[in-house]
Amino acid sequence: MAPKSMLKHIRNNVVWELPEDYKGCMKVPGRIYATEKLIDGMEKGVFDQVANVACLPGIYGYSIALPDAHYGYGFPIGGVAAFDVEEGVVSPGGVGYDINCLAPGTKILTEHGCWVKVEDLPKMLTDQKLKVYDVDEGREDDSEIKFVMERGIEEDERAVVLVTESGLTIEGSEDHPVLTPEGYVELGEIEEGDLVVVYPFEGVEYEEKEGTILDESDFEDVDPQVLRYLEERDLIPLRWSDPKVGTLARILGFAMGDGHLGEQAGRLTLSFYGDERTLRELKRDLESLGVKANLHVRKRRYEIETASGRYEGEATSVELRVASRSFALLMEKLGMPRGRKVETPYKVPDWIKEAPLWVKRNFLAGLFAADGSVVKFKRYTPLPINLTQAKVEELEENLREFMNDVAKLLREFGIETTLYEVKSKKNVVYKLAIVGEENIKRFLGKVGYEYDPEKKVEGLAAYAYLKLKERVKKDRKEAAETAAEVYEETGSITKAHEAVADVVNRRFVERVVYDGGISSVRVPEDFPTFERFKEERVLAGGFVIEEVVEVKGVEPEYDRFYDIGVCHGAHNFIADGVVVHNCGVRVMKTDLTEDDVRPKLRELLETIFRNVPAGLGSRHRRVRLSTQELRQVMLYGAEWAVEEGFGFDEDLDHIESRGNMTHAYETIGWEEYGPRDDVASKRAIERGRPQLGTLGSGNHFLEVQVVDEIYDKEAAEKMGIREEGQVTIMVHTGSRGFGHQVCSDHLRIMERSMRDVERRFGVRIPDRQLACAAMGTDEAKRYFNAMNAAANYAFANRQMISHWTRESFVEVFGDEYGDADDMGIEVIYDIAHNMAKIEKHPVDGEERWLVVHRKGATRAFSEEALKKHGEPVPFEGLPQPVLIPGDMGTGSYILIGTEKAMEETWGSTCHGAGRTMSRAAAKRKFWGEDVARELERQGILVKAASMPVVAEEAPPAYKDVDEVVRAVAEAGISDPVVRLRPIGVVKG
């Protein structure tokens, strides 16, 4: 929910201000354009990101969020910000259901922190869920398995092996998608030096065990209602094969640390204590078992007596209370002691001692979440992790027994510990210490923490860090051995250093040779401390960015791949929501009506689907580009496409910047920031050549629409729209994998340049996802060169798709209505909605050049502004058209820009409906086939490359586009012209 109490109402209940004191570093206020209904639906993260953007150097006016805003990478999607062209920055942060084809032997991590070989998943007796990364929420999650399939390997098909810097290895088919900081990239397209996102936890192998832990006979002495409650939740009988065993072991471990089982008002209850976030995670586990629990937060006085003195004060106490007597009794049967634990003898339950290793892992992870210390570092070295428990003096022996039981469990994971007593005036206190880097690494990689978010994220980050440190030390040790061998053979320090120069410096080699070797290898001086590593590499939820150190194609030594279908996938705005993708939308009008098209609508969709290549690098190729031709696309965009016969010269007058960013930047005198053809790596060229002229998947689409309602008849007529029922065509796609690759090649440069920005402007960037470069620097110019080259690719892509769509209409309706010209198929407008552009705007009464970032936002210029920037005026006497796609089941809009938008939002408005539900959530909730059937019932036909994509784009997954448009209209930053409704949808 939004922090509504912080928002200041400006006007019309659709314009709101986020004050500068929301975050101390804000240089300007935030400005939110949304109805109260839309405000209520915005994640708090949107407002935090608005505030973070307001902290960037050189920002003017406001950090803006439009009504379709939702949480993004760095900037909110639906965000706008303008920066001084001399004293500001450019930031890439401003501008899904996957089937994975994996090699046998691949380890798949489950919800319980254990792994299963992919080929063994169908054989498992349990229905454990798999662990996934919910990108929307920045946290791990779990998902049910939809299916596990196997397929034979095709003749001459190769596999790809990818190795990261910490040693993580994955092998799969070339089209297996891998998550990178910029989104999903196919395994076959990853290169050495690329970055990928990993989950740094090894876990232990899943092991099945037969038999029963508890059954009805264990509850013969209790009220039958207790047994009924447990049976209704499938908690009795409790068998080893039930995945709930892992959850119960976790809960029991935490309860033995921070839980209390006792009577309250004569009723047995179970309570847990701790940090609110920790208890909310625990509450999720309880609810997954069907057990209700309530959080209670209160202030309380405390008194603590330690060896060093007595302390008292006030603290906030948080309790998670389970009212169910039945569940409390179940926990008691599982070994939870009744009464004050400090005064009650207990031990590690026998069933835990007898359990498979993965169950023991969950018990320990819950226990250490409660009573274990968080991992800490002294620069490069981890400090001991301690488990602390106390008893009254009479129970010292019982305490030692319990701690020794825990030590024995840890030893089964290869983790050695030390037990020692801590001085205490009141009770006997013992600490079980995990000491030594190897032991700590094993604990973090195999056991770790559950529930406590801080401990868990720190633990995951620490494990990744220690694995990286281990690999670096190993490389340096091998370099020392190699250097010594080369020196012995050649007698040359120079040759010895040349042999290992990519790993160590010359001084290291000299020490190896002259000092008789190196007794113990340490990390180099420039190796990051743990704190710096976290800052640079760790994402929300403990996921970590790692560099790929090896990629190789291999001949499979097996005869089949395995495919996993899950009901959860990562939200793809990490890829699509950044500048580099330059997504955009185009609308064309026709002189046909719905009555003309409806009888042959299905045939039309089939024809478009056949003529317009879809998907990820569709095999159906209409164009085969040479490298030189692709370089021409990078420089000239849609103009290149028209010269090659894809469309007409008149089309260019209805495209933002005539579809040619070279011309646009030459016109305004900033040609050094325009596109260049030398910014593309070999890999970008390889990706771009086959994908030009393809629609793409995800939220990319081609729709056949009809005019549903006309609001401004004069403006509509100037656009060629005369009546309701008239057919239009909307194309939504972008720069495909080429844009991703070109700009991701430059992203690491931007990340490095951020330190220069902080030094230059004396600021601290509040979010590392706001990587940026100071305008005027080579890094900023190169980024613009790359981004504008990708923009040209996108303009050319939409131009080619439009041409083939015209041909499809002629193929289906030509005999009856003539050629494309006879049918009046003309471009109304084509505009990008993920771009940063250099534009001139008034600031404090003075015209200034600004860098305007529009992420998931659309330019909405007045006619005067178009002329000032040398932009084509598509319709004389009208502001620039604005195209707002909705969802498949409702509609889209054509708006026009306003003077109010020029004054307040740098000539910007919303770009679409905006999501309310992640793709993962949509696929959990909807079946693509059901969505398609329901749309057909409404008169909307869908032709898609896959049904999961249809599920992702289900209408309920989006905000109400009518509400979004109402917000910008009432705010005065756009005026509605027509509403369009879909009748046919083509998706890649």
Swiss-Prot record:
Comment on bound cofactor: Binds 2 manganese ions per subunit.
Residues that coordinate or bind GMP: 699-703, 833-834, 885-888, 892, 911-914, 987
GO BP: any one term: intein-mediated protein splicing
Keywords: Autocatalytic cleavage, DNA-binding, Endonuclease, GTP-binding, Hydrolase, Intron homing, Ligase, Manganese, Metal-binding, Nuclease, Nucleotide-binding, Protein splicing, tRNA processing
InterPro entries according to UniProt: Hint_dom_C, Hint_dom_N, Hint_dom_sf, Homing_endonucl, INTEIN, Intein_C, Intein_endonuc_central, Intein_N
Residues binding Mn(2+) 2, per UniProt: 583, 732, 833
Active site: 911
Binding site for Mn(2+) 1: 98, 583, 700
EC numbers on record: 6.5.1.8, 3.1.-.-
Presence of the UniProt keyword Cell inner membrane in the record: no
Domain (DOD-type homing endonuclease) ranges: 251-415
Catalytic activity of the protein: a 3'-end 3'-phospho-ribonucleotide-RNA + a 5'-end dephospho-ribonucleoside-RNA + GTP = a ribonucleotidyl-ribonucleotide-RNA + GMP + diphosphate; a 3'-end 2',3'-cyclophospho-ribonucleotide-RNA + a 5'-end dephospho-ribonucleoside-RNA + GTP + H2O = a ribonucleotidyl-ribonucleotide-RNA + GMP + diphosphate + H(+)
Posttranslational mods: This protein undergoes a protein self splicing that involves a post-translational excision of the intervening region (intein) followed by peptide ligation.
A molecular function (GO) term: metal ion binding
Cofactor annotation: Mn(2+)
UniProt similarity note: Belongs to the RtcB family.
Self-association state and partner proteins as the record states: Monomer.
Task of the protein: Essential for tRNA splicing and maturation. Acts by directly joining spliced tRNA halves to mature-sized tRNAs. Joins RNA with 2',3'-cyclic-phosphate or 3'-phosphate ends to RNA with 5'-hydroxy ends.
Something else known: Ligation proceeds through 3 nucleotidyl transfer steps, with 2',3'-cyclic phosphate termini being hydrolyzed to 3'-P termini in a step that precedes 3'-P activation with GMP. In the first nucleotidyl transfer step, RtcB reacts with GTP to form a covalent RtcB-histidine-GMP intermediate with release of PPi; in the second step, the GMP moiety is transferred to the RNA 3'-P; in the third step, the 5'-OH from the opposite RNA strand attacks the activated 3'-P to form a 3',5'-phosphodiester bond and release GMP.
NCBIfam families (alphabetical): intein_Cterm, intein_Nterm, RctB_rel_intein
Name the record gives this protein: tRNA-splicing ligase RtcB
Taxonomic source organism: Methanopyrus kandleri (strain AV19 / DSM 6324 / JCM 9639 / NBRC 100938)
Species lineage: Archaea, Methanobacteriati, Methanobacteriota, Methanomada group, Methanopyri
